[in-house]
Amino acid sequence: MADIWLATDERQKPYALRRMHERLRFNLLARRRFVRGAEILSKIGDHARIIGYVEHGKIKGQLYLLMDYVEASNLKQLYTQHDPVLLENVAQILIDMAEGLEHMHENGFMHLDFKPENVLVTRNASVRLVDFDLAEPIPEKPRKASKKNPGTPAYMAPEQLQGEPISHRVDIFSYGVSAYELLTNQKPFPGETPGEILAKQFDRSGFVPPRQYNSDMPANLEKVILRCLERDPERRYPFIGMMVRELQAALYV
């Protein structure tokens, strides 16, 4: 949807410049998503686990978003490459990305596309959440998922895939999928299509608990992940702050 460029100001301070692809210049839906994501980022407020917002606007018809520059790789790149930054800091990364989501929720927004590709990690293991194009305000009560807000099927909650009412708990499910994958290098509900993924989410007969792939995982950490992955949103954590506290206890006791 967009390219990221390195930009500098008159003092040579670096920034990350996100520009919408030229081929989407006249795509109204894509433009709305880009602007919405920029506006939501501007409203989330400063936080150590969220990419810093500078400004957004339009120059000669081209939409842009200017952000803090962070020299980093995304989380998927790190675990695909077995990067030592991840291997040495996995516990803190798990907590930091959860705290980023917690800050979003506390400020009234849900991400709706939380996945490893949208988590940046620097060489000193500092985490930043990015890409808020699909984010939306948290509704007062679960509302029907938009068919025009697809997300990424492998990380979507069952209610998202079915187009049923959604709430902030879809982010908790997506976090559980991401944490499971990070710790096992496997997806909890593998499938080539949204239908196949949804079928695995409902029929758990083939589900493999993460400790079967990674026996070094603390049992209490597995409990946190399994609660995040509950099919029924009411059985997941009611709010992500509770999950963060249990995650911290599981990883640092």
Map each language-model feature to its residues.
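Activation segment signature within eukaryotic-like protein kinase domains
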Residues: 93-94
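AlphaC helix of the eukaryotic protein kinase fold
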Residues: 24-43
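Protein kinase catalytic-loop region centered on the HRD/HxD motif
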Residues: 99-109
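Activation-segment/catalytic-loop signature of the eukaryotic protein kinase fold
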Residues: 56
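Conserved short submotifs of the Hanks-type protein kinase catalytic core
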Residues: 60-74
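AlphaC helix of the protein kinase catalytic domain
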Residues: 75-85
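Conserved activation segment of eukaryotic-like protein kinases, specifically the C-terminal portion
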Residues: 146-159
